[in-house]
Amino acid sequence: MFSSLYPLARASLFKMDAEDAHHLTLRMLGAAGRTGLACALSPRVPDAPRTVMGLSFRNPVGLAAGLDKDGAAIDGFAALGFGFIEVGTVTPRAQPGNPRPRMFRLPEADAIINRMGFNNSGVDQFVKNVQAARYRGVLGLNIGKNADTPIERAADDYLYCLERVYPFASYVTINISSPNTKNLRQLQGAGELDALLAALKDKQRRLADLHGKLVPLALKIAPDLDDEQVKEIAATLLRHDIEGVIATNTTLSREAVKGLPHADEAGGLSGRPVFDASNAVIRKLRAELGDAVPIIGVGGIFSGEDARAKLAAGAALVQLYTGFIYRGPALVAECVKAIARG
């Protein structure tokens, strides 16, 4: 029912400011999840089990971080058939993010530009929301740094968030690739990344001993990397035994949307224009990593065939964001069925 109604809902939502529509959708999904209405209206999604990072996934199609930054609608999203859910990015302290307007649709290109800036209610409220959810499937918790934390102290924020979310996460994503927090992408540099991952792995080992379980770490990287940078990141992942990598975040490139309304807005571009760049990074990572580190592919998936292409490039799992906004819940089932066909 959601799938058949979504085109009508989208027509109304797309007449609204993009961020207002986003918040309205979150409130509706949150309410639907709490009342059980989402389950009653959701499309049938077949099981297509996968085991990745030592975790059992109902199917390989997940929700990407960013749609539910505070973990307020986990049950609503889960009812739509996703094989796993990732929420965040969360920071140690609540922060408002960048000034509005900060989210722009480019429907001619099936794209979105956002410069949200890790707006969130802080890790304490985030953990409360996660604990309140009834969902018991694979749940990724995505962590970042506060905007006013100097980049030299970024590790402190990641370590603090890791400690807070660890008991409640199936896996934890280290987001160092958002273009909307000043200097954040510097952490992708070889020296900076080596130091950060060393600290996080040490913390992970101590938390595993404390809680009696090893929660995998995944690193989320940008599409705007040259071959040498991808090689350096891959080598660092292997050196520190990082359990997963998510490729990719949004792009700063505007090559594919030149001349379109809002194309010159600052921020990260997501959607169809990032599809090829994301796949290229996935292929390069797979060549460097072999089968040692699984890849979660995200960026520009608008069809089942797009999801299959991500897996063909080397991903073990995929995530949806902008395609889900444009296509709605039907895209989840379409991707799962296409992947299950092989």
Swiss-Prot record:
Pathway: Pyrimidine metabolism; UMP biosynthesis via de novo pathway; orotate from (S)-dihydroorotate (quinone route): step 1/1. Its main location: membrane. The active site is at S178 (nucleophile). Keywords: Cell membrane, Flavoprotein, FMN, Membrane, Oxidoreductase, Pyrimidine biosynthesis. The keyword Transcription does not apply. FMN binds at A65, G66, L67, D68, K69, T89, N142, N175, K220, T248, G271, G300, Y321, T322. It is a peripheral membrane protein. Binds 1 FMN per subunit. GO terms for molecular function: dihydroorotate dehydrogenase (quinone) activity. PROSITE patterns: DHODEHASE_1, DHODEHASE_2. It catalyses: (S)-dihydroorotate + a quinone = orotate + a quinol. GO terms for cellular component: cytoplasm; plasma membrane. It holds the Pfam family DHO_dh. Its EC number is 1.3.5.2. It is found in: Cell membrane. InterPro entries: Aldolase_TIM, DHO_dehydrogenase, Dihydroorotate_DH_1_2, Dihydroorotate_DH_2, Dihydroorotate_DH_cat, Dihydroorotate_DH_CS. Its cofactor is FMN. It comes from the Bacteria. It is an enzyme of class 1 (oxidoreductase). GO terms for biological process: 'de novo' pyrimidine nucleobase biosynthetic process; 'de novo' UMP biosynthetic process. Monomer. This is Dihydroorotate dehydrogenase (quinone). It comes from Burkholderia pseudomallei (strain K96243). The gene is pyrD.
